[in-house]
């Protein structure tokens, strides 16, 4: 892709800004705003898998370095899931966003906060109903397992969700559900 050399340069500069110890934290916080995060997460719908991988790396670094932007990242990811579920029904980066979310879930402290539980129930569990489920089933299953590992009581809403979205008549998807 001829554009990739330019895009990779932009992402390298952004990564440098995020990681640099020479740039004051206040400046980073000012420019990497909630709106910036929303636009960054929207880029995960890129048709280029290489760009999505770069975005994943940048998002991980922002999440780790700018703790005050963590909630904005989680909100933007959830909003992307909502848009995918209830509006567009198409998104190229759901599996990559689930990979990011898995590392975020892994860092959750106990007890699980109500906002994280709501994310599970309102955006993650409904992802099972989508026709594209097979494209991201491994990553979604891993997120479900991490939630249960953190709090066993969350297995009940997950099982109820699987039963609610059971893919009757789609044997391939049924097998994926059983494996989960």
Task: Name each model feature, range by range.
Residues 6, 16, 30, 39, ...:
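Histidine (H) residue identity feature
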Residues 1-5, 39-51, 68, 83-92, ...:
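Short coil/turn segments at helix-helix junctions and helix-capping linkers
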Residues 25-48, 56-62, 80-84:
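Asp-box/WD-like beta-propeller blade repeats and closely related beta-sheet repeat scaffolds
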Residues 1-42:
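Eukaryotic helix-linker segments that join adjacent hydrophobic helices
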Residues 6-18, 53-60, 91-106, 134-148, ...:
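Amphipathic alpha-helical elements of HEAT/ARM-like alpha-solenoid repeat scaffolds that form extended
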Residues 28-38, 70-78, 94-97, 112-124, ...:
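Core helices of alpha-solenoid repeat scaffolds
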Residues 159-164, 180:
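Short, flexible active-site loops
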Residues 56-118:
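Internal metal/ion-chelating core segments
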């Amino acid at each position: 892709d001829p554009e990739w050399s330019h895009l990779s340069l932009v992402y390298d500069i952004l990564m440098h800004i995020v990681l640099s110890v020479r740039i004051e934290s206040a400046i980073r916080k000012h420019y990497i705003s909630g709106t910036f995060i929303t636009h960054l997460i929207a880029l995960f719908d890129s048709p280029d898998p290489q760009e999505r991988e770069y975005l994943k790396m940048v998002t991980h670094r922002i999440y780790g370095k700018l703790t005050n932007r963590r909630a904005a990242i989680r909100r933007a990811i959830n909003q992307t899931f909502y848009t995918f579920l209830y509006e567009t029904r198409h998104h190229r980066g759901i599996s990559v966003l689930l990979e990011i979310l898995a590392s975020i879930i892994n860092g959750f402290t106990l007890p699980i906060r109500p906002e994280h539980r709501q994310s599970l129930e309102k955006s993650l569990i409904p992802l099972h109903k989508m026709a594209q489920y097979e494209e991201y089933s491994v990553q979604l299953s891993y997120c479900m397992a991490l939630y249960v590992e953190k709090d066993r009581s969350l297995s009940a809403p997950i099982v109820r969700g699987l039963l609610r979205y059971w893919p009757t008549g789609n044997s391939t998807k049924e097998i994926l559900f059983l494996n989960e």
